[in-house]
Amino acid sequence: MGIRFGVQEEHSFAANLAWAEKQAAVQVKSAANALEASQHVLSYLEALWSIEKDHLHIAVDVSSFPRTSLVAIYSAIWASARASRPISVSFLYSFAQFTEPPIDHGPITEFGAVSPEFSGIGEADFGLATLIGLGYESELALAAQQVMDPALTWLAVPQSLDVRFDDAVRKANDLLINIVDERNVWSFPVDDPYSTFVELEMISHGLQRTHNVVLVPLGPKLLVVACLLVSSIHRNVGVWRVSPGGLREPREQLAAGPVAYISAIFSGTH
């Protein structure tokens, strides 16, 4: 199933849509928002359950999803899973060719939990610890740090297959990197999402003993998935977003070739 969101349908979208509609095995569904996308996924999964009674294995390509829709689709899969009918999910990400950072990311219009179920559960006597993923959007990362004003700040710096991307991200976020304790600047491998998840879970597990923890996954989409997985395990850990919403100017992205993925089993609890 492919989901069409009806916004920012520019650049190579028409060619991609034409290809998908020619594939007999692909159902193209239109979704006006993240809720409709999640409803399409729930219906799709229920149809699969009518065929496979015990266990599903699905793949979700997160490369082009808006983050709000990614969260909604993740939640829909979680809602469909049961202990008696688990769902194995592989989240895939196709790396894009390097492009220079955009000059303007647009004004910030959205800030808060990615959805109510990922808002986190705070302890009244704990301070706030925030882990912010870094990407090209340096002003969004700075805004998250300044608005949340945490007692402790961690930064997640992506290490990609292209050193030009790494250099551009560090250059864009130089101010924030320099004001955060270097011991709290964590580099994670974009091409190894399982290791990223394991390390993120360890960091979050340690922080939650003394702090209310909020993860803000700017940067690569697989970091969003890792944060959602961690929050699904540690329900007191929140996942928040800061975004210009639909005001960001769309850009053409070409696949570089490599694909990374992380797999998890959803059973209605974790």
Regions found by a protein language model. Give the residues of each.
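An N-terminal, globular interaction/scaffold subdomain
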Residues: M1-A47
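Active-site histidine-anchored catalytic micro-motif
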Residues: F65-L70, R85-P116
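Redox- and metal-dependent alpha/beta enzyme cores, enriched for Fe-S-associated oxidoreductases
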Residues: L134-I203
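Active-site glycine-rich loop that binds ribose-phosphate moieties when present
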Residues: H105-D125, L134-L142
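Gly/Ser/Thr-rich loops at beta-strand to alpha-helix junctions
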Residues: G6-E10, A34-Q39, D61-A72, F95-T99, ...
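A short, acidic, amphipathic alpha-helical segment used as a generic capping/interface helix at domain edges
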Residues: L45-W49, D192-H211, L223-S231
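Short internal beta-strands
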Residues: M1-Q8, S90-Y93, L152-V163, R241
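Short, flexible loop segments at boundaries between secondary-structure elements
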Residues: R85-P102, R235-S267
